[in-house]
């Protein structure tokens, strides 16, 4: 993500999603985890449908509807190229400008509905979902409070019964930390054993 700060605005250019690449493990509504890929062309078709129906796609902060930063009718350009969904925007929001100065913008995420997908069993025991089509509702800038589900750049948010389900692709920091604890623990153990391994290697070298 490229961030260019100017006196009265910030220019941001980056990829919301790189297509055909696995996400981080995402928990579904039942707590079961899966990985996901958005297939090439899915975003392009979603953008075409939105344009045909005169529906602007919003730019939000952290998927919060009360923190709208713009839309595709004003300050946001969205396009799918050979890498994925690219977003280019100009933002004058003071909070976002401050977060940009402080290096607190982590990346992008997106919210969508009506996913058409195929599933398969992945090698690591998780399900892998291939999203072939979707209706793009919004794209979001993600700050230090969340982590994008797609590393190249979760939770499923269910609305009440009168609205459609909207899936978002970012995780709370606390949730992501829990997911990564086992790897953190391994690194901590390896680091604590390092001095002893070095001493053992020196003793073995002297004996030889």
Where are these regions (language model features)?
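Polar/acidic, low-complexity leader/linker segments enriched in S/T/G and N/D
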Residues: 1-51, 156, 166-186, 191
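Residue microenvironments linked to proteolytic maturation
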Residues: 3, 11-13, 75-172
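Acidic/polar N-terminal loop/beta-strand segments that form early-domain functional surfaces
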Residues: 15-17, 60-64, 90
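Flexible loop/turn segments at secondary-structure boundaries
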Residues: 22-23, 67-68, 117-119
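Glycine-rich, flexible loop segments associated with nucleotide phosphate handling
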Residues: 32-41, 55-57, 127-132
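Short conserved beta-strand and strand-loop elements enriched in small hydrophobics
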Residues: 53-67, 108
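Protruding loop/beta-arch "assembly-hinge" segments enriched in small, turn-prone residues
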Residues: 142-208
């Amino acid at each position: 993500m490229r961030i260019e700060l100017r006196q009265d605005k910030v220019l941001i250019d980056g990829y919301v999603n790189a297509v055909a690449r696995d996400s981080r493990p995402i928990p579904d509504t039942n707590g079961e985890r899966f990985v996901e890929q958005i297939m090439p062309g899915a975003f392009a078709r979603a953008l075409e449908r939105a344009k045909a129906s005169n529906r602007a796609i919003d730019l939000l902060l952290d998927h919060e509807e009360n923190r709208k930063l713009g839309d595709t009718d004003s300050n946001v350009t969205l396009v799918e190229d050979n890498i994925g969904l690219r977003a280019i925007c100009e933002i004058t929001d003071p909070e976002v400008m401050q977060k940009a100065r402080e290096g607190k913008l982590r990346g992008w995420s997106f919210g969508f509905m009506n996913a058409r997908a195929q599933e398969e069993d992945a090698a690591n025991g998780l399900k892998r979902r291939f999203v072939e089509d979707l209706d793009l509702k919004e794209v979001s800038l993600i700050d230090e409070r969340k982590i994008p589900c797609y590393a190249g750049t979760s939770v499923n948010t269910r609305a009440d019964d009168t609205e459609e389900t909207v899936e978002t692709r970012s995780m709370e920091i606390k949730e992501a930390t829990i997911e990564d604890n086992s790897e953190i623990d391994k690194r901590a153990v390896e680091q604590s054993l390092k001095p002893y391994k070095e001493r053992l290697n020196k003793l073995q070298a002297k004996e030889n």
